[in-house]
Amino acid sequence: MRFDKSKEIFDNTKRYIPGGVNSPVRAFKNLSITPPVISKGKGCRIFDIDGNEYIDFVLSWGAMILGHCDPDVVNSIKEVVEDQIAFGAPTEIEYKMAKLVCETAQVDMVRFVNSGTEATMTAIRLAKGYTGKKKIVKFAGCYHGHHDIFLKEAGSAVAELRLKGIDEDIVQNTIVVEYNNLDSIEKAFKENKDEISAVIIEPVAGNMGVVPAKKEFLQALREICDLHGSLLIFDEVITGFRLSLKGARALYNVEPDLVTFGKIIGGGLPCGAVGGKKEIMQCLAPQGNVFQAGTMSGNPIVMSAGYATIKKLKENPDIYTYLELLAQKLEGNLAKVFSSSNLTFCINRVGSMLTVFFGVEKVENFEMAKKSNLSMFKKFAEYMITNGIYIPSSQFEAMFLSSAHTESDIERFAEVAEGFAKFVKKP
C-alpha cells in the first residue's frame, strides 16, 4: 500500500492540530507507518484518500456496532437535520431516547452528555454529592476519560505517555488498585475508612486490551460497596449496548448504582450518558444540587442517531447472536494460526470485542498486559494495516466486530494473520 496523500495531509495537519490528531491514539506514534487519512466508510469497510480499502476492526473504537453509515441511522439524521440541529431547549426526541435507554439498559433514569469522559465525570460528581465522601477507587489500566481524576495509572494511549499538567491535589483523592485483585480493594477500604464515595470499574476492560473482570470479583465489589456505604459505578462506555442491550451487567448479574454509556449510544455521533437508581439520579440539577450542564447535550441530531441505533438493536436481538458467532470464529481462526506457527499468545475475548497479546499465555490485569511482547504487537499492527486489515495501533486497545462483517471478512483476517505469522518466522 502507498500512503503518499495520507502522509502529505497528515504532515500538513500537524501545522494546525497538535500531533496532527484530535485524540492521541490516532497518530500511530508507536508504529513506523503513517496513519491513513480516511475519506469514506460503508458497512465494515473504510477507505483512505490514497484509494486503499480496509476491513475495519476498530469501528470508531467500538461505536459503529451496525457498521459505518448504516442506512437506518443515516436516514434518522436526514429526517431531522433540516429542521432541528441544536436549540439548547427540550425536544421530543430526548424523551423518546431517554425512555428507550431506560427500558433497554434497565436503569431508572438517565442524563445525556456529550462524551464518555463527561459521563464518568458526572457519575463521580454525583457519587461524591450523594455520599458526601471525597475519595474514589479506580483500577490500574482502566480508562475512564481524560479528566485529571481518572488519569492515574490509566490505560488506552495514556499507558504510553508520561503525563504533565495533572492536578495532584485532585489526583490524591484517587486510589488505584489492581484489577481482579480482591486483596487490593479490601486494603484500600481498610486504609480509607468512611472516605470512599465510589468504586468505578470497566466490568470488561477495553483499554489495557480486552481484560474481563472475574464474576466473583465484581460480586465482591458489590458487597464491599454496600458494606461501606460507597457507590459502585460500572463504566460501560465501551461495553454498553455492545455485549447486550444491558451491556456487561447481563453477563455478570451484578447491578451497579450508576452506569456510564458512550460510543454506541450516540450511533456514531458525540454522546455519553450516566444512568442509574432514581434516588441517586434525582440529585442532579435542577432536581437536586449536584450540578451538570452542557449546551449540546441531548441535541436532536445525536438523539436521533442514537435512537435509531438502539431501536434497531432492540428489534433485532439476533444481531448479538450473529456477532458472537463471528467473534468465536475469529478467535478460533487466530488461535489456530498462531498455534500452528508456535507463537506464544493469548486471546482475550468477550462478545464482539477482543485483543491478541503476544509473548504471554494469560492476561488478567494491567501489569500482565504490560508484560506482553509490545514489539511483536507493533509488527502485527503494521502488517495487518498495510495488508488491508484495520486494527488498533496500540496493544492497549480492543478490536471490535459489527453486524456488517461477514464470515468472509473473518476468513480474510485469518489469512492476513497467517501471512504475518510466516513473516515473523522468517530466519
From Swiss-Prot:
Q: Which Pfam families match?
A: Aminotran_3
Query: What does the record give under GO molecular function?
Result: glutamate-1-semialdehyde 2,1-aminomutase activity; pyridoxal phosphate binding; transaminase activity
Reactions catalysed according to its record: (S)-4-amino-5-oxopentanoate = 5-aminolevulinate
| Cofactor(s), by name | pyridoxal 5'-phosphate
Supply the EC number(s). Answer: 5.4.3.8
Assigned keywords, A-Z: Cytoplasm, Isomerase, Porphyrin biosynthesis, Pyridoxal phosphate
Q: In which pathway does it act?
A: Porphyrin-containing compound metabolism; protoporphyrin-IX biosynthesis; 5-aminolevulinate from L-glutamyl-tRNA(Glu): step 2/2
Chain positions with N6-(pyridoxal phosphate)lysine modification? 263
The GO biological-process annotations, alphabetized, read as:
protoporphyrinogen IX biosynthetic process
Query: Where does it live in the cell?
Result: Cytoplasm
Q: Does the keyword Cytoplasm apply?
A: yes
Q: Which GO terms describe its cellular component?
A: cytoplasm
Subunit and interaction comment:
Homodimer.
- Family label: Belongs to the class-III pyridoxal-phosphate-dependent aminotransferase family. HemL subfamily.
Protein name according to UniProt = Glutamate-1-semialdehyde 2,1-aminomutase
Origin organism of this chain?
Caldicellulosiruptor saccharolyticus (strain ATCC 43494 / DSM 8903 / Tp8T 6331)
Q: Which gene encodes it?
A: hemL
